[in-house]
């Protein structure tokens, strides 16, 4: 039976922020920042005095140098609506630093996330084409994805959430927060959140990169970084194409991204804009019955935010933000066949909104309050309510018209207070959420996070949070020969508990965590009877996810500077599900297919002079008929101040495996490339 499922497993993740009140971007969204394996890199898009803008000897360099010199107690994090330092924060977030990204054998953000034990990445195509990402046993629709604090998740479907307009070279760090976080990020943070933080250098430079390899794959990237006074700007673009590693998996990807920042005594500003485009053969991505599917997606986004500080001591900070993103999707059930009868659909989703966050420090702690209003508007040939003919909208490039419309407004009100006494932190907050797609009433989602730090090495923490997710337009309106949505679906609800501890000392750090998530009215695509031929979107009842994870890193370059191995990093996660329902469920497509076990191992070592190697091993076992598999990747790299040359191989054992349904993944994929960076 064809299974196209998606799930994530438990793992300790950590969000991290930068020093100084400098990351309004995160403060604005009340992001959760945390420090975990290896990074004290700051969390900001591009702040004039943020760590990401400082010279090589600063925080980023410290990721690969001496951690002991990092003043963790000075680093502000956003595990709460009011920014707290890393030591004060009651949250732990997993941070994938720029140094980690540069060493990894990775072609996309999705490849990087595969190395986080608690993240489940189910890939359909190479280079991150059509990827489902989930956390802690949830599904791909249950996480919030942010770019510099801007929520870029899609109300249409989570399948296209990973269409990022940035390349790996644009990224300062990736932060992963696991567990329900509605009171910080809003109702869409049902099982976790991922924030991608970009960078802009403090110097003028131009970077050009190119690569090529297996399956006719080639591509290139270029960027320009400008720093003038208090203004920092970066513009980048890239193109990649490939014949794909399996039948009908060819693709072409284009992207462009711009980010900037400006800083003054009382006001800091950050802004960004981006575009991504993908055209790809969709093989059997959505149905095993059709092997010649095709899809093309386009994404446009923009945001701007300010950090207003009436007093220089940051006793009160106001952070407004406005944002917009458009997602355009063209799908053909059979490549080249046009028309609704042939299974061709068009969708255009516009999401826009604004937020305002304020936080104040006073005698009894730190208090934060905020509001976010988000409007989602979809035009489609398949999703939404049928419109009168005089309201149909022409579709560019075809004689068809959008004849359906869906729209809803999501309003979130936030309130939080933080108490810090010695090594003890208590952070309690409340989200009041109203969505016009429901009954128009405000619903309350509280949360409490507690941590205790007996000394600089140890930290223990516990949390309890609630969240809700409304169905996507795909869940509600899909209707074709193999799938049927349901406009009567109820929203999902989640109550999550998490406990854990972190230990960090010179040359070593580890995080151990456990979680229990109680889900009700969980949405999945299932066969309602054993004889069913069509998957149906249903509320499948109660689904409890429980598990634990451990993530540890040994930084041998700090303990044994002359030893050829510089770092060893290992992680393991286990998850168990308990499902109960009043009716029968057969053939789960997503929610009941989860990673029971996942283990990761990374080893970095020197070879000769500037020549280094990075190895990554991943073993995982998925439930419901999937065979366990082991995958090994390697990257050889020669690094110099102005250039970088590398050869990387994905799946060096040439093992054929399946992440999702019967979508076969490629064997060994070898790429070689180089980049040059010139200052001016």
State where each predicted segment sits.
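Extracytoplasmic beta-strand/coil segments of soluble accessory domains associated
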Residues: 110, 114-150, 154
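Flexible loop and strand-edge segments within Gram-negative outer membrane beta-barrel domains
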Residues: 242-253, 268-318, 322-351
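N-terminal periplasmic "start-of-domain" segments of outer-membrane beta-barrel proteins
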Residues: 71-102, 132, 140
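Short acidic/polar hinge/loop motifs at secondary-structure boundaries
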Residues: 132, 151-178, 196-199
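Structural signature of Gram-negative outer-membrane beta-barrels, strongest in the C-terminal barrel
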Residues: 322, 364, 397-519, 565-566, ...
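Gram-negative outer-membrane beta-barrel transporters
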Residues: 420-425, 516-518, 539-622, 675
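Short strand-turn segments of transmembrane beta-barrel domains in outer membranes
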Residues: 192-193, 198-226, 235-249, 292
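Outer-membrane beta-barrel signature, preferentially recognizing the C-terminal barrel domain
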Residues: 287-311, 347-349, 439, 459, ...
């Amino acid at each position: 039976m064809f299974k196209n499922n998606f799930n994530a497993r438990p793992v300790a993740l950590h969000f991290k922020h930068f020093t100084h009140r400098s990351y309004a971007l995160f403060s604005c969204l009340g992001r959760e920042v945390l420090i975990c394996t290896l990074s004290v890199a700051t969390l900001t898009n591009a702040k004039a005095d943020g760590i990401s803008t400082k010279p090589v000897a600063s925080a980023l360099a410290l990721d690969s140098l001496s951690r002991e010199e990092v003043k963790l107690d000075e680093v502000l994090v956003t595990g709460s609506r009011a920014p707290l330092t890393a030591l004060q924060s009651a949250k732990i977030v997993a941070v994938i630093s720029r140094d980690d990204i540069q060493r990894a054998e990775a072609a996309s953000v999705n490849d990087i996330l595969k190395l986080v034990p608690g993240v489940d990445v189910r890939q359909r195509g190479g280079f991150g084409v059509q990827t489902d990402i989930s956390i802690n046993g949830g599904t791909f629709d249950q996480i919030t994805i942010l770019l510099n604090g801007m929520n870029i998740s899609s109300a249409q479907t989570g399948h296209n959430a990973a269409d990022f307009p940035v390349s790996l070279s644009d990224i300062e760090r990736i932060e992963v927060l696991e567990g329900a976080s509605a009171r910080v990020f809003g109702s869409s943070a049902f099982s976790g959140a991922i924030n991608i933080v970009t960078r802009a250098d403090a110097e003028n430079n131009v970077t050009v990169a190119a690569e090529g390899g297996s399956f006719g794959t080639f591509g290139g990237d270029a960027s320009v970084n400008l720093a003038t006074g208090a203004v920092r700007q970066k513009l980048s673009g890239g193109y990649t194409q490939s014949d794909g590693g399996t039948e009908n998996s060819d693709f072409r990807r284009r992207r462009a991204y711009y980010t900037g920042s400006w800083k003054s005594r009382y006001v800091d500003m950050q802004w960004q804009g981006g575009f991504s485009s993908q055209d790809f053969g969709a093989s059997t991505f959505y149905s095993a019955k059709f092997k010649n599917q095709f899809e093309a997606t386009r994404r446009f986004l923009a945001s701007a935010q300010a950090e207003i500080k009436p007093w220089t001591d940051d006793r009160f900070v106001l952070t407004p933000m406005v944002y917009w993103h458009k997602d355009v999707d063209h799908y053909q059930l059979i490549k080249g066949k046009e028309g609704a009868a042939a299974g061709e659909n068009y969708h255009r989703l516009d999401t826009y909104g604004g937020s305002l966050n304020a936080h104040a420090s006073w005698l009894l702690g730190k208090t934060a309050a905020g509001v976010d209003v988000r409007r989602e508007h979809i035009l489609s040939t398949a999703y939404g309510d049928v419109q009168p003919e005089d309201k149909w909208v022409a579709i560019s490039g075809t004689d068809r018209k959008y004849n359906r419309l869906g729209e809803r407004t999501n309003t979130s009100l936030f309130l939080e207070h933080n108490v810090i006494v010695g090594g003890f932190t208590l952070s309690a907050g409340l989200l009041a959420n109203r969505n016009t797609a429901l009954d128009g009433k405000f619903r309350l989602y509280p949360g409490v996070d507690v941590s205790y730090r007996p000394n600089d090495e140890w930290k223990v923490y516990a949390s309890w949070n609630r969240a809700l997710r409304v169905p996507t337009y795909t869940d509600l309106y899909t209707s074709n020969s193999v799938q049927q949505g349901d406009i009567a679906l109820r929203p999902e609800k989640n109550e999550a508990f998490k406990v854990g501890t972190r230990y960090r000392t010179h040359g070593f750090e580890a995080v151990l965590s456990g979680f229990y998530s109680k889900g009700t009215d969980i949405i999945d695509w299932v066969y309602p009877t054993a004889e069913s031929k069509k998957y149906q979107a249903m509320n499948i009842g109660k689904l409890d996810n429980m598990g634990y994870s451990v993530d540890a890193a040994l930084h041998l370059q700090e303990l044994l500077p002359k030893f050829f191995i510089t770092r060893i990093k290992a992680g393991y996660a286990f998850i168990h599900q308990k499902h109960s329902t009043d009716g029968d469920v057969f053939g789960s497509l997503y929610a009941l297919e989860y990673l029971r076990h996942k283990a990761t191992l990374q080893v970095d070592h020197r070879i000769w002079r500037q020549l280094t190697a990075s190895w990554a091993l991943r073993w995982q076992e998925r439930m419901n008929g999937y065979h366990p598999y082991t995958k090994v990747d390697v990257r050889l790299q020669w690094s110099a101040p102005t250039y970088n040359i590398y050869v990387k191989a994905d799946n060096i054992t040439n093992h054929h495996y399946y992440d999702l349904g019967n979508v076969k993944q490629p064997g060994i994929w070898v790429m070689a490339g180089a980049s040059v960076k010139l200052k001016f």
